[in-house]
A protein has these predicted regions:
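Glycine- and charge-enriched loop/helix tracts that form the active or gating conduit
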Residues: 1-159, 163, 173-190
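Histidine-centered divalent metal-coordination motifs
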Residues: 169
């Protein structure tokens, strides 16, 4: 009574704000734990232990064996977190995002016109970051309608769908990219 039994060093992980796997088989036993690790990072502001990140990167392909409804449940919770953008970047760096959303890959390196200083992928991530910033200060940005917006975004599903929409907002650009022969300007008609 009153004594904490900590077989895996969880207290130290909490103090260090780290998410760490408890065994090498943890992701093979349940691939959805890959997403859960990222979700915990997003929700708690934690970071992945380097060995854990390496292992989930190696086993990310196992996500294709997981039930889609379990994957979507974790993704909704992850994207509903106030600051998921850094975690989405990390998911991209580990290859997890490409497994979940292969349609995002063509955005990388897709150059834009002079109105954009970033390629489409970097722009999409930047847009997600700005959306998160806006959501944190709705009354300042929308002084007359922030309460209605906040009510719409009360459920984690609505908040997640908004952020996913922002991340995917330029998905059509790679397929519609063209070059105006007269001006030499990059175009995206119909995106």
């Amino acid at each position: 009574p009153g004594r904490i039994i900590d077989l895996f060093g969880g207290r130290k992980d909490l103090q260090r704000a780290r998410v760490r796997m408890t065994s090498d088989a943890v992701f093979a036993d349940d691939p959805v734990r890959i997403l859960r690790g990222f979700r915990f990072c997003a929700q708690l502001g934690f970071t992945l232990d380097p060995a854990t990140q390496q292992r989930l990167q190696e086993q990310a392909g196992l996500l294709s064996q997981a039930a889609p409804e379990r994957i979507s449940a974790e993704l909704y919770k992850l994207f509903a977190s106030p600051a998921c953008c850094p975690v989405v970047r990390q998911m991209d760096q580990t290859g997890v995002l490409e497994i979940l959303f292969p349609e995002l890959s063509p955005l990388k390196g897709c150059q834009q016109n002079e109105y954009h200083h970033l390629d489409v992928w970097a722009h999409s991530l930047e847009a997600l970051k700005h959306m998160e910033d806006i959501l944190e200060c709705l009354p300042d940005v929308f002084p007359n309608s922030w309460k209605a917006l906040q009510e719409l975004l009360e459920t984690y599903q609505n908040r997640a769908v908004l952020k996913l929409g922002v991340l995917f907002h330029d998905l059509g650009k790679p397929d519609t990219q063209g070059l105006n022969p007269k001006t030499g300007r990059i175009t995206f008609y119909g995106h």
